């Protein structure tokens, strides 16, 4: 990951009714969207009015059932395993994962103040 370590990579929102929230943000900030097939339903990639891919809005179902209804920013880390060890030793909690995504893994943690963040990188 090198020079990208510590940078924000992606933002996801996981909610019970993704279509309703997708339409809300489309009206409020002008986002457009593309469907992403997941099992027997669709989640959504969110784009700016100019077409730049910026976020995801996901259903709180299946593997995402335990995720909080919050915007979660994902940060690139060198080693998800080492970051998880540091998280727990400093009073944080592992909320979900680690989960595999292509060659990398991601995990959602909660810091000691209660805020959520995602970590993305090599195992």
Give residue spans per PLM region.
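Short helix-capping and inter-helix turn/linker motifs at the boundaries of alpha-helical repeat units
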Residues: 1-2, 97
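Core segments of cupin and vicinal oxygen chelate
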Residues: 2-52, 89, 105
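Short glycine-enriched loop/turn motifs at secondary-structure junctions
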Residues: 4-6, 65-70, 101
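Short, structured motif recognition centered on aromatic/hydrophobic residues
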Residues: 8-12, 70-74, 117
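Vicinal oxygen chelate
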Residues: 18, 49-52, 73-113
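Conserved short beta-strand elements that form part of the metal-binding/catalytic scaffold
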Residues: 31-68, 112, 116-122
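A short acidic/small-residue loop/turn micro-motif
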Residues: 102, 122-123
């Amino acid at each position: 990951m090198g020079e990208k370590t510590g940078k924000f990579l992606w933002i996801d929102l996981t909610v019970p009714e993704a279509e309703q929230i997708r339409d809300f943000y489309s009206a409020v900030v002008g986002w457009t969207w593309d469907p992403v097939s997941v099992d027997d339903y669709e989640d959504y990639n969110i784009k700016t009015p100019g077409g730049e891919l910026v976020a995801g809005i996901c259903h709180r179902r299946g593997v995402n059932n335990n995720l909080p209804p919050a915007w979660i920013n994902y940060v690139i880390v060198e080693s998800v395993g080492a970051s998880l060890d540091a998280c727990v030793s400093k009073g944080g909690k592992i909320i979900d994962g680690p989960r595999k995504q292509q060659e990398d893994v991601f995990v959602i943690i909660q810091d000691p103040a209660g805020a959520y963040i995602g970590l993305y990188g090599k195992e």
